[in-house]
Amino acid sequence: MEILKDYLLHICFILFPILLYQVFWLGKPAILVPKINSGLVTLFACGASVLCIIFPIHEMDYIQYGLQMIPVIICLFYISTASGLTVAASVLCFELLFYEPSAMFVFTLLPFLIIIPILFQKKWPFMSKAKKLLLSLLISCVEIFLFFASSWILSALNILNFQKSGIFVYEAAVSGLFRSSVLLLSIYIIESIAENIALRSQLIHSEKMTIVSELAASVAHEVRNPLTVVRGFVQLLFNDETLQNKSSADYKKLVLSELDRAQGIITNYLDMAKQQLYEKEVFDLSALIKETSSLMVSYANYKSVTVEAETEPDLLIYGDATKLKQAVINLMKNSIEAVPHGKGMIHISAKRNGHTIMINITDNGVGMTDHQMQKLGEPYYSLKTNGTGLGLTVTFSIIEHHHGTISFNSSFQKGTTVTIKLPADLPH
């Protein structure tokens, strides 16, 4: 019964910081998934590891058993190498200061346990939940094997002496199984929390889009008809005789340009109101990306911006090619307008990743702050002086209608990367 109490205590040490972080940091309502607070996660992970060392599960031949390595693995996968190494260093220092025999095992296992997460660190965010759990199980098996191997090596060198080898093997196996189970449980909970947060963000965005679409449907048609009449009478008003005056010609140009801008805004409203009008078919996304890039080259040249396109061949996808093309154009246009004149670089790529097709649009523009990224996609929010924000709102709707996701990774004055993920599965 005592050992069961120790096991439950260690489970609390590992899972409580995860749930605490979810409540205080990820529980904030936001359209986009909140950015990970690396410092806070690292602090929680260090605390969890130290508690596992202070309150070990049991002792045998002066060896402490615990779950102190699990926060290291979690930080390496979900935060960064620096975060994982910080937690690992805190574990090793605490072991050396207070539990020297255990530090021998930590020092032996640590390099091997760190290498595997670092090797898969870049691929980890794009793995499915099943693959992540499978990789975590592999790491646990490697840890158990290395633990047994280092135990016998240290015993053979008379550094540590295990008097009851049978009991040691049994307890080490039970401890290894327990560590594997808690690591898998932790990964599963983290992935479930991430899925729920993403779903919540989509629901918040969908509610806002529904309100805007209803408004667009009721207002757009009523406004478009008077604008058409106004445009016709403006052209009649500024006849050939009137246009001989230079100021009159400038007035006509200004009035017509503003009417065209109003017409464009109404068109965007109608695009949101007609989200049900999608003509889906199987098409080659790589060809669409190349075609869209070619169309945007002239606009980019006007802004002295270089556009590069890189796509894998035969990226077949099921969707509305016209709508997706509009979404890509909107994003590329925003990128071109965000980069400095004469020094701009836009790179668009498309590739398959399992059952997902990823489109990345990267620029070296002015970038965005976290607050600005949180508001992207909201109607009427724009980073441009004369912008309405409707173009990006329409883009969000198009991606959402194709059961995809769109995310932004940006640093102020360093550039932005837009990532679109679309399902690659074709209808049977």
UniProtKB/Swiss-Prot annotation:
A Gene Ontology molecular function term of the record: ATP binding
Cytoplasmic-facing ranges: 1-6, 59-68, 121-132, 188-428
Catalysed reactions, as listed in the record: ATP + protein L-histidine = ADP + protein N-phospho-L-histidine
Superkingdom of origin organism: Bacteria
Pfam families, sorted: HATPase_c (PF02518), HisKA (PF00512)
Keyword DNA repair belongs to the record: no
SMART domains to which the protein is assigned, alphabetical: HATPase_c, HisKA
InterPro entries: HATPase_C_sf, His_kinase_dom, HisK_dim/P_dom, HisK_dim/P_sf, Sig_transdc_His_kin-like_C
Gene Ontology BP terms: positive regulation of sporulation resulting in formation of a cellular spore; sporulation resulting in formation of a cellular spore
Sites of Phosphohistidine modification: H221
GO CC list: plasma membrane
PANTHER family: SENSOR HISTIDINE KINASE, SPORULATION KINASE B
General function of this protein: Phosphorylates the sporulation-regulatory proteins spo0A and spo0F. Spo0F is required for the KinB activity.
Protein name: Sporulation kinase B
Species of provenance: Bacillus subtilis (strain 168)
